[in-house]
Amino acid sequence: MVHAKKYYLCRMMSYQCKIGCIGLVTALMICSCNEQKQPHPMSSSLSSNDTMEDTIQIYHHITLDSTEQLQIYYPHFKRMDLVCGAMPQPTDTSVIMVCAAAFTGQLKKEFSHENIAGNHVSGGVYHKGYPCKANTGAFVYAHRQWKFIYQDYAAEVAQAADESGMGFGQMMLINNGLRMPANVVGKNICRALCERKGKLCIIESRQPLLLIDFIKFLGRYGVTQALYLDMGEGWNYSWYRDNQGIVQYIHPKTLDYGTNWITFYR
């Protein structure tokens, strides 16, 4: 397997390393976070070929929505956290949804917070991760309030620890309705933590998309904030709990590469 040589190299910036490890996807992904580009307003226009047919299913633990291009999950949560080291198990009935959050640097058998991209807060405790240039934004949560931050988010993440909350850095896709600079080559299943109409949700593409198209469809769905979430075989293992409390797997577990997960609790 090919490993990232230095912690300061973000896996997203050299995404071919992860792709080489899983041996399934050959597209080279290159993030252009350092380019001096201006945010672009999200287009609200729809072409005749891009219909938006919403299908909403409301359950006790979660509301599901979908369009032709997107699958949307609205967890009915009372609290949330960034769980690190060991992914929450389906036997923990307090968990209603879980998926990967920040990037993981190297493929290691032993867990360390330093292998998570960017400084982060888990269970109210502040941890230092490795520097990652692709992390252009962050998400923080404390006292049942959340916030998306674009750039200069270090103080906000530290404050989340002071307030016994959670927080992590990632690649910002949409901030206040504006598309942020993010240029990735190749089609992939994409996932993001989003805010739409004041509600928090997880949104995933239903088929492999260029990242620029995924962002476009998020905008058309009405997303005003979007932070990328880690994906790829070994990182995409995720699930939610249905009305009967039965776990529904979004992506089954294949490889143990993940290090951190955004976790919603009832």
Region spans (language model):
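Active-site-adjacent helix-turn-beta-strand microarchitecture at beta-sheet edges
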Residues: 108-178
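Bacterial N-terminal signal peptides that target proteins for export
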Residues: 5-21
